[in-house]
């Protein structure tokens, strides 16, 4: 898995608070247990005019022409509230999002996002409002995320964010739980060699 050190991308301004996981990926799409294929169902109720997903809703921001190809989601407070379904970050990642910016995230959603190699950035409500205003006034322009410096550059302004050092290390180096375990493969092998045969 590639590390996420820096990222420049287009921003989708989702001007809504308390966006829950059922809005992100409705329950009827949760049958699969692999991480791919959920992007087309992202924000199903808002994004489409029909249950078969054949008609896009032209009034939903994700469908606006100027935001096609966006990789950064900007939202209001309490993003990802509701049930703990891991399919929510799967759907966001499968659509192409790599970074989310909001004043706050639901705890389980926040951790699930990090576990799925997405970067949720918490900024103050005032800072998020400033970014909304900039995005609306500068359609088509990208912003820059620097995880090494822990900064968000929007136009000529720099915002600083915080992230647990362990989580930062994992994202920078592209490590998931398996990757972390394999970093200690030699120590694990050495320990296993000392275990009595009847316990193996």
Swiss-Prot record:
GO terms for biological process: L-leucine biosynthetic process. It catalyses: (2R,3S)-3-isopropylmalate = (2S)-2-isopropylmalate. One of its GO terms (cellular component) is 3-isopropylmalate dehydratase complex. The keyword Hydrolase does not apply. InterPro entries: 3-IsopropMal_deHydase_ssu, Aconitase/3IPM_dehydase_swvl, AconitaseA/IPMdHydase_ssu_swvl, IPMI_Swivel, LeuD. SUPFAM superfamilies: LeuD/IlvD-like. Pfam families: Aconitase_C. Disulfide bonds: none annotated. It is an enzyme of class 4 (lyase). CDD domains: IPMI_Swivel. The keyword Lyase applies. GO terms for molecular function: 3-isopropylmalate dehydratase activity. Pathway: Amino-acid biosynthesis; L-leucine biosynthesis; L-leucine from 3-methyl-2-oxobutanoate: step 2/4. Keywords: Amino-acid biosynthesis, Branched-chain amino acid biosynthesis, Leucine biosynthesis, Lyase. Its EC number is 4.2.1.33. Catalyzes the isomerization between 2-isopropylmalate and 3-isopropylmalate, via the formation of 2-isopropylmaleate. HAMAP family: LeuD_type1 (MF_01031). PANTHER family: 3-ISOPROPYLMALATE DEHYDRATASE SMALL SUBUNIT (PTHR43345:SF5), 3-ISOPROPYLMALATE DEHYDRATASE SMALL SUBUNIT 2-RELATED-RELATED (PTHR43345). Belongs to the LeuD family. LeuD type 1 subfamily. Heterodimer of LeuC and LeuD. This is 3-isopropylmalate dehydratase small subunit.
